[in-house]
C-alpha cells in the first residue's frame, strides 16, 4: 500500500513521517555495508544501515528519477532545436543546514549512493568551505569573527565554479580547506571533470540575492533541519570530541583548547554557539529552508524523523 503523506491545505509541501517515507524505497536493495556507513558518519552521529535504508535509499531513488527526467528534458530541447546531443549537463544538488546538524554526512551518503546507479556513476562532492576567503583576507576585511556568514565567502568564485561545471567545462578546480589549519590550503585544489552529478554542500548555499546566486543553478536541494536546542547540544558535544582529537594535531588552529577541562570547554563552545553559529543560523541559514526541494527533519537522537518534499 502506497503511503499517504499529510498535506496541509494550501501547503507547497508533502509531509511524510519516517514510516511513510521508507515505503518509497520501492524494494531498492541495500548497497552499503555497515563498515562503509561508519566511515561516512560525522562526529557524534548515530546513522546506521536502518537510517540508510529508510531515509537515504528513498531519497537517492527520488534524485535518480529527477536526473532521468532532466536528461529527457534536455533531449526534448535538442529535438526541438534539431541539434545533435551535446555534452551532458551535470545535475547539480545543493545540501544546506546549520553547523553540526549533519549536512556533510548527508552529502557524503548521497554521493556514494548516487554513484551506485549505472546511469550516473560520476558524482563529485564539493564543500563551500574552500570558497571562504583565506584567513589573511578575512583579517584584512575585519571578518574573522564572521567566518561562516555569507560575507565571508568568495561568492563570485563559487558561482563561477558551479557555472563552469554546469556549462560542461572539461576541468574545473575548487580550493581545498583544512579544518585543522582553519584556512584554505595554498595551491591545493579539488579537480572536477564533467561529472554526471555535482553535490555542493555548505551553510549558505540556498541563499538568494539581487543577482544570480549559486542556488539558482541547483536542480535539486536538501535542507537538513533540527530543533535549535538539539543542534546546540550536538555542537557542544562535537566541540568536546574535537578537543580530544583534531585540536591535538600538529598545527591545529584550535590547539589552545586541547587541554581545557570539560566545564571550561563547554562554556567556550556555548559562547561560540551563541555569539557566532546561532546568529548565523537564525539570520541567514534557517530563512533559506523554504527554498529547499526537500527537508530532512531530525529528532534529538540525530536521526531523521520526518521528510518534507516540495510539490512545486
UniProtKB/Swiss-Prot annotation:
GO terms for biological process: coenzyme A biosynthetic process. HAMAP family: Pantothen_kinase_1. Keywords: ATP-binding, Coenzyme A biosynthesis, Cytoplasm, Kinase, Nucleotide-binding, Transferase. This is Pantothenate kinase. The gene is coaA. PANTHER family: URIDINE KINASE. It comes from the Bacteria. It comes from Corynebacterium glutamicum (strain ATCC 13032 / DSM 20300 / JCM 1318 / BCRC 11384 / CCUG 27702 / LMG 3730 / NBRC 12168 / NCIMB 10025 / NRRL B-2784 / 534). It is found in: Cytoplasm. Its EC number is 2.7.1.33. One of its GO terms (molecular function) is ATP binding. NCBIfam families: panK_bact. CDD domains: PanK. Belongs to the prokaryotic pantothenate kinase family. ATP binds at residues 97-104. Pathway: Cofactor biosynthesis; coenzyme A biosynthesis; CoA from (R)-pantothenate: step 1/5. It catalyses: (R)-pantothenate + ATP = (R)-4'-phosphopantothenate + ADP + H(+). Its main location: cytoplasm. One of its GO terms (cellular component) is cytoplasm.
Amino acid at each position: 500500500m502506497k503511503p499517504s503523506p499529510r498535506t496541509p491545505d494550501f501547503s507547497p509541501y508533502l509531509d511524510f513521517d519516517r514510516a511513510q517515507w521508507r515505503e518509497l524505497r520501492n524494494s531498492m536493495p541495500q548497497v552499503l555495508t555497515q563498515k562503509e556507513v561508519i566511515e561516512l558518519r560525522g562526529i557524534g552521529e548515530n546513522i546506521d544501515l536502518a537510517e540508510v535504508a529508510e531515509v537515504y535509499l528513498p531519497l537517492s531513488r527520488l534524485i535518480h528519477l529527477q536526473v532521468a527526467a532532466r536528461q529527457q528534458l534536455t533531449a526534448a530541447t535538442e529535438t526541438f532545436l534539431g541539434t545533435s546531443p551535446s555534452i551532458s549537463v551535470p545535475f547539480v544538488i545543493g545540501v544546506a543546514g546549520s553547523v553540526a546538524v549533519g549536512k556533510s554526512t548527508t552529502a557524503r551518503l548521497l554521493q556514494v549512493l548516487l554513484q551506485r546507479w549505472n546511469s550516473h556513476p560520476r558524482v563529485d562532492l564539493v564543500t563551500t568551505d574552500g570558497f571562504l576567503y583565506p584567513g589573511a583576507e578575512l583579517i584584512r576585511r575585519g571578518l574573522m569573527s564572521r567566518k561562516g556568514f555569507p560575507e565571508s565567502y568568495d561568492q563570485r568564485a563559487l558561482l563561477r565554479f558551479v557555472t563552469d561545471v554546469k556549462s560542461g567545462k572539461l576541468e574545473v578546480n575548487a580550493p581545498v580547506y583544512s579544518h585543522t589549519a582553519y584556512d584554505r590550503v595554498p595551491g591545493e585544489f579539488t579537480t572536477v571533470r564533467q561529472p554526471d552529478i555535482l553535490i555542493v554542500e555548505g551553510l549558505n548555499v540556498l541563499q538568494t540575492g539581487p543577482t544570480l546566486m549559486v542556488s539558482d543553478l541547483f536542480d535539486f536541494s536538501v535542507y537538513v533541519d533540527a530543533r535549535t536546542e538539539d543542534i546546540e547540544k550536538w555542537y557542544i558535544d562535537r566541540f568536546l570530541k574535537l578537543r580530544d582529537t583534531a585540536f591535538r594535531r600538529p598545527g591545529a588552529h584550535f590547539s589552545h583548547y586541547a587541554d581545557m577541562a570539560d566545564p571550561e570547554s563547554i562554556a567556550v563552545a556555548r559562547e561560540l554557539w551563541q555569539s557566532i553559529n546561532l546568529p548565523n543560523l537564525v539570520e541567514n541559514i534557517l530563512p533559506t529552508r523554504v527554498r529547499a526541494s526537500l527537508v530532512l527533519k531530525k529528532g534529538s537522537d540525530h536521526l531523521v524523523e520526518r521528510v518534507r518534499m516540495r510539490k512545486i
